[in-house]
Amino acid sequence: MRISAAGGGTGGHLYPAVSILEKLAEMKKLNVTYFCLEKGIESKILPLEHPEYKLIKIDLKGLERPIWKPSNFTRLLKISQSESIIALEIKQCDFGLMTGGYISYPVGKVCKKLKKPFFIQEQNVVPGLANKALSLSAKKIFVAFDKTVEFFPKSVRNKILVTGNPVREKDNEEMLFGKDYVLVLGGSRGSEFINNLMEEVYKVEHNLKFVHSTGSKEWVDRLSIFENVKAVDYIYNASAAWKGARAVIARAGATTIGEMLYYGLPGILVPWDGATGSHQLYNALEIEKMGKALVLKECDATVSTLLKKLYQVLEMDKKPKMKINPAEIIAKTILEELK
């Protein structure tokens, strides 16, 4: 089975795609072509984790807001020019899988042009521009939240399946860092804001253990002076890190909230103010409404406020892990739809 996949720029778009592809690979023999942004995280991660995937690197930039900015003309032209390269690969595929980010749009557009069925998966409460545009032609649309349905055109809502966010997991993986620690995550590229805030927290909080993914080796060195903090620049086997944690402090990106809900971990979500369309804030508020987390906005974030919320979170019960990974539901549905 030949698949053309796209989704990247950040881990929030990449990892859901990879988790679905990994589940599909358990059910069928796959031949995967993955369309990457030249400077996206997928261009670095996929050669390490899935060297068997054929990578096609495309030099694109996302549209600036508002969309009518003159600089977007050049960007739209590049997107259009990339379609001929994409078409050469998609001619060979059985179907497409897109998980958002602007690389998804030209890939989905070419699938439509060549009459290849394709599926989209949306991780955030408010869908991105690429997925909204592709929804009209998609065979099936997978979303993480019930609320997301209302943001899509009424004409496509009969194609939407609410599954939750797909998660990568290895059941036989041992816990990496022991157990009963607070997991601190700044997203796939790290967060200077969270790093700076937590450095101040570590100066006064010595009773709790922390595992902190910093995004850079410089921050690992800087935080190494704290005995109760295990700092790493990046956590490659995330499932092992989640299994030993008792709570999480993190941004509200799609990968994080998917794993948080899957592993039943309570936490503090600090939405990134710079996220497109405030999607992290909407994600965080939805999780808080579900009673699974507390939201801490950047403008309210102080050491005392964070610690107060952290001790509240530690009183919340850790829920049992989900019985079925949404990635499995999505993979099975795709195969059913293709029959």
Curated annotation (Swiss-Prot):
Task: Please verify whether the record's keywords include Transferase.
Answer: yes
- Name the PANTHER family for this protein: GLYCOSYLTRANSFERASE, UDP-N-ACETYLGLUCOSAMINE--N-ACETYLMURAMYL-(PENTAPEPTIDE) PYROPHOSPHORYL-UNDECAPRENOL N-ACETYLGLUCOSAMINE TRANSFERASE 1
Q: Name the major location.
A: membrane
For this protein, what reaction is catalysed?
di-trans,octa-cis-undecaprenyl diphospho-N-acetyl-alpha-D-muramoyl-L-alanyl-D-glutamyl-meso-2,6-diaminopimeloyl-D-alanyl-D-alanine + UDP-N-acetyl-alpha-D-glucosamine = di-trans,octa-cis-undecaprenyl diphospho-[N-acetyl-alpha-D-glucosaminyl-(1->4)]-N-acetyl-alpha-D-muramoyl-L-alanyl-D-glutamyl-meso-2,6-diaminopimeloyl-D-alanyl-D-alanine + UDP + H(+)
Please give the HAMAP family that the UniProt record associates with this protein.
MurG (MF_00033)
Please state which protein family the record places this protein in. Answer: Belongs to the glycosyltransferase 28 family. MurG subfamily.
The entry's function note states:
Cell wall formation. Catalyzes the transfer of a GlcNAc subunit on undecaprenyl-pyrophosphoryl-MurNAc-pentapeptide (lipid intermediate I) to form undecaprenyl-pyrophosphoryl-MurNAc-(pentapeptide)GlcNAc (lipid intermediate II).
Residue sites binding UDP-N-acetyl-alpha-D-glucosamine per the record: T10, G11, G12, N124, R168, S188, I235, Q280
Q: Which GO terms describe its biological process?
A: carbohydrate metabolic process; cell division; cell wall organization; lipid glycosylation; peptidoglycan biosynthetic process; regulation of cell shape
Q: Where in the cell is it found?
A: Cell inner membrane
Q: What topology does the record note for this protein and the membrane?
A: Peripheral membrane protein
Which domain of life, per UniProt?
Bacteria
- Stated EC number for the protein is 2.4.1.227
Family matches, as InterPro entries: GlcNAc_MurG (IPR006009), Glyco_trans_28_C (IPR007235), GlycoTrans_28_N (IPR004276)
User: A Gene Ontology CC term for this entry?
Assistant: plasma membrane
Its recorded name reads: UDP-N-acetylglucosamine--N-acetylmuramyl-(pentapeptide) pyrophosphoryl-undecaprenol N-acetylglucosamine transferase
Q: Which UniProt keywords apply?
A: Cell cycle, Cell division, Cell inner membrane, Cell membrane, Cell shape, Cell wall biogenesis/degradation, Glycosyltransferase, Membrane, Peptidoglycan synthesis, Transferase
**Pathway(s) annotated for this protein in UniProt:** Cell wall biogenesis; peptidoglycan biosynthesis
Q: What class of enzyme is it?
A: transferase
Organism of derivation = Pseudothermotoga lettingae (strain ATCC BAA-301 / DSM 14385 / NBRC 107922 / TMO) (Thermotoga lettingae)
**Gene Ontology MF term list:** UDP-N-acetyl-D-glucosamine:N-acetylmuramoyl-L-alanyl-D-glutamyl-meso-2,6-diaminopimelyl-D-alanyl-D-alanine-diphosphoundecaprenol 4-beta-N-acetylglucosaminlytransferase activity; undecaprenyldiphospho-muramoylpentapeptide beta-N-acetylglucosaminyltransferase activity
Show the SUPFAM superfamilies listed in the entry.
Answer: UDP-Glycosyltransferase/glycogen phosphorylase (SSF53756)
